[in-house]
Amino acid sequence: MCIRDSIGMQIIIEGLALAAFNLAKQTSNDPVFRDMLYLIIRDEARHVTFGVNYLEEYLKNLSKDELDERAMFAYEACVVMRGRLLSAEVYEKFGWNVEESLEFQSKTDVTNNFQHLLFTRVVPNLSRIGLITDKVRPLYDELGVLDYESWPTDGDIDWASLKQPLDLSETA
């Protein structure tokens, strides 16, 4: 597997999945669905953990230029992912004022909560593996997500508990 694929899939896309499943869990009133999501989130967190553990060691062996290239790739993936969460194409297709619609959408609780869930999963892991470099740090700051860099965990990965057998006490 190409390292870009691993960064893109196991850090960025799996982080997106964690955010989506967490949002669904937060907004659902169905206890069975919430229990199912708990298990799915745990499984997704294991995928991210594998990627973090692998990439953390692998990236240490790259040259500064190679690391900066991968850091820029991860940043660009975050920008694309953030942009895909907004529905500019839909607004345009329906003939709505795109700027007004995007401004409205960016202020909704659902959008803000999802963006928070998304970047609190992705940014701490990018930092942990060494992809928040001096070159891209200002770009993440402009994106408004650099505050998450120093979070000790992404909210789903409890490194110690993932080594333990599955605890079903949190389910119904």
Q: For the regions a protein language model found, what residue spans apply to each?
A:
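Alpha-helical transition-metal enzyme core signature, strongest for iron centers
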Residues: Q10-F21, I40-G51, L55
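Conserved small/polar residues in nucleotide/adenosyl-binding loops
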Residues: M1-S6
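Extended, helix-rich structural scaffolds rather than catalytic motifs
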Residues: K64-A172
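Short capping loops/turns at secondary-structure boundaries
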Residues: I7-E14, Q26, D30
